[in-house]
């Protein structure tokens, strides 16, 4: 199928002894029905009342048996459902017109069974006729009563009580009822049992038109899923058949319903009105929006109304003259339904598990064909399985030899081998870059050229001038001492005495800690972006330092140990971190502290501007509201006065025109200010990130400075001084501290070695150590935060 087709609409007339032959006539083709009314004499001579109607339908079922109704209406829909097409059969009409009889029939007599039992019977008979397919049948029974959803099969013992109320949910696969139970049936008898169980739970009431009137809409759904038994295809088909028994419409003034029946009739008429609105919208090809969500009935039937299914409508009418108005209303609904078009399509799905199995079989077959092809071309040594570690190592060796020049070419064997060769090229190049970087780190201290704080620090230390050249850099090849540039300024003596680690120790801290090469500030080692500072043990600098020491030894000294006088006396106990932090901000961390304060001031300024802009926006919004009220007042005043031209155009006075212009300007200004506010918020977020980054950097460098200044043992201080054997900043602090550990530290290490003998105590001691470390960390951070607030 796949082409668009119109909905089939049939009319079934309820048998009666008082049939209005003069008013209701059928066409000879049994596809049309004509209605004729006599003019009302009470309306006088001039009477334009319509008296004749003609309706073209797909069939008129008058005095038709249940067998004929099913053969005409439902048999093709059910048959095509087993081929993968969805189907919907709906019964519509006024109260007592025979809708439930058409759908369900009389359960007391087998011959009088309706469309629904016959559809179940046909489904299972067709399943028996298709032994090549494994077809699964599931059913559900939904009731819509007073705009509430109920599961008619919830009373079964194996169906648990619903905790949450049922709701209608949409997904890419369609519309389904969340909370509605779906029951698997393997036999026709089981399906009938479920049908009768649901029928006993339906809400019925006595009515003037029908003793057992259905007071709710009911939807019985049959879900089908067919898999092929013979073919190993992963594709299977699904379908569903919606059998809808609508509640009957009625004229409240005519039926005289009261109490609960009146309330039910109100809900029924309301939902049927929304259904008719949806049908009218579906019949109009120019409509973009279909009001499916106006009521539960139309929402639940969204897939059935105008979807990809075969749809049939059975309109039940009275043949009596007293019910002619309701008959006309039902026939109008049927004619509108015929304008709706659907596009039936097969619902095909794919079984993931079977698809995997088929792909595995196909892969094995392709491997066999490839092996035959390789054997015919004398390539028996080629394998297409995933490579193991030995093969990958061999390819890595080939790539290295190719880069070194000892291998001229790499033989191409397979596509998998080519991909692995490119992968190993990436691995080898990455390893070479890491080796070059580690070599540079061992020989040089790397400083990022974009790290202005580190550059400023080494300029203050006197090692690099403002142009980025090393101080004392040789200008010629014949003399090694060189001449310092004139722009280089010597450090003050007082400052060098106060900070006994200047210049090299502070330089190392700012090079190694403040701008770590393995951090985010230096992602790639490059000579174009990085300043290389030779260490004290390299080449000319080492000679220069040795000559400086020889020169200084000739000069007279005031004492036998001048180095001891230059080094200040270290306090027995280190100062508190808040005090040390203030000293650090004024000296070694002054540059970072300055940047931190600048960023913070910029952040505060942006926040102030954002606050002012917000206040301005609020003021504009208030003015817009006032202008709107004034404009609405002018409009209402103009409408009351009725100022119109001859052509029907409205006349706007000058005051209203000025208000419109003012409102337009205010809205434009509001949008502009709001855009500025969004930009300011983005700047605030960026500035906040910079402030947090500077704060973290300041605290981190202070921690390193504090550890190097007061925690490292004194014997290690001598090694870290200029001219010592170890350059400061190159050895981690925890390794340096461990060199001067006391007996308690040695006992802790001994305890860690002895612990494996008693495994039960490992968790206890490890937890204790972690808690102590956590408390120490929190204590330190609280002290730093208090110092920062000051």
Curated annotation (Swiss-Prot):
Chief location: cytoplasm
Record's compositionally biased regions (Basic and acidic residues): 537-552, 561-570
Cited SMART domains: KISc (SM00129)
Function: Essential for normal male fertility and for progressive motility of spermatozoa.
One matching Pfam family: Kinesin
Keywords: ATP-binding, Cell projection, Cilium, Coiled coil, Cytoplasm, Cytoskeleton, Flagellum, Microtubule, Motor protein, Nucleotide-binding, Phosphoprotein
Phosphoserine modified-residue sites: 546
Residue spans of biased composition, Polar residues class: 525-534
InterPro entries: KIF6/9_C, Kinesin-like_fam, Kinesin_motor_CS, Kinesin_motor_dom, Kinesin_motor_dom_sf, P-loop_NTPase
Gene Ontology biological process: extracellular matrix disassembly; microtubule-based movement; organelle disassembly; regulation of flagellated sperm motility; regulation of podosome assembly
Molecular functions (GO terms): ATP binding; ATP hydrolysis activity; identical protein binding; microtubule binding; microtubule motor activity
Organism field: Homo sapiens
PANTHER family, sorted: CENTROMERE PROTEIN E, KINESIN FAMILY MEMBER 5A
GO-annotated cellular components: cytoplasm; kinesin complex; microtubule; podosome; sperm flagellum; vesicle
Taxonomic lineage of the native organism: Eukaryota, Metazoa, Chordata, Craniata, Vertebrata
Taxonomic superkingdom: Eukaryota
Subunit structure, interactors included: Interacts with HYDIN.
Family: Belongs to the TRAFAC class myosin-kinesin ATPase superfamily. Kinesin family.
Domain named Kinesin motor: residues: 6-340
Region named Disordered: 477-578
Residue ranges the record marks as coiled coil: 342-380, 658-690
Residue positions where Phosphothreonine is found in the record: 530
Localisation: Cytoplasm, Cytoskeleton; Cell projection, Cilium, Flagellum; Cytoplasm, Cytoskeleton, Flagellum axoneme
Gene transcribed to yield this protein: KIF9
Protein name as annotated: Kinesin-like protein KIF9
Chain sites annotated for binding ATP: 12-14, 93-100
